[in-house]
């Protein structure tokens, strides 16, 4: 009976170990990402990411060095890969777009993808509606 109990506990532990290691998203997404948002290629620079919390605050710039360069602010959840940020006008902090997506599990090339919603047509906000995006770093 003792051997059967130990064998059962070992099997449950082994199965649980695989589940616990199933996550694997990057702990940090700070850096320069090559992105395409609705056929517009450019860069997303994530400059900062907070160090604590299930979801962590991020800041940066989208399309830096271009006429449509804007600051971004949002969050990244390294335990689920979820990502969301808003693209803002620097002059008045108004939101132009809301980007929502997921980061792939950690790999040689990290990838992200999702949709963005354009909520303003001001200064690079584009046409109102929802569009796709993808990125790699």
Q: What residue spans do the PLM features occupy?
A:
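Bacterial N-terminal signal peptides
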Residues: 7-15
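General helical structural elements
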Residues: 6-7, 91
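Sec/Tat signal peptide C-region and signal peptidase I cleavage site
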Residues: 16-22
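Positively charged n-region of N-terminal signal peptides that target proteins for export
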Residues: 1-4
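Low-complexity, intrinsically disordered or weakly predicted helical/coil tracts enriched
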Residues: 15-16, 128
């Amino acid at each position: 009976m003792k051997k059967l109990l130990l064998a059962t506990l070992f099997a449950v532990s082994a199965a649980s170990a695989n589940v616990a290691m199933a996550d694997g998203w990057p702990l940090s997404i700070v850096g320069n990402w090559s992105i395409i948002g609705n056929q517009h290629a450019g860069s997303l620079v994530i400059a900062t990411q907070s160090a604590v919390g299930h979801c962590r605050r991020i800041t940066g710039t989208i399309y830096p060095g271009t006429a449509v360069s804007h600051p971004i602010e949002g969050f990244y959840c390294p335990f689920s890969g979820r990502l969301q940020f808003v693209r803002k006008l620097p002059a008045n902090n108004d939101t132009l777009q809301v980007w929502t997506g997921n980061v792939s599990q950690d790999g040689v090339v990290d990838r992200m993808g999702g949709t963005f919603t354009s909520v303003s047509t001001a200064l690079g906000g584009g046409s109102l509606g929802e569009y796709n995006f993808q990125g790699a770093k």
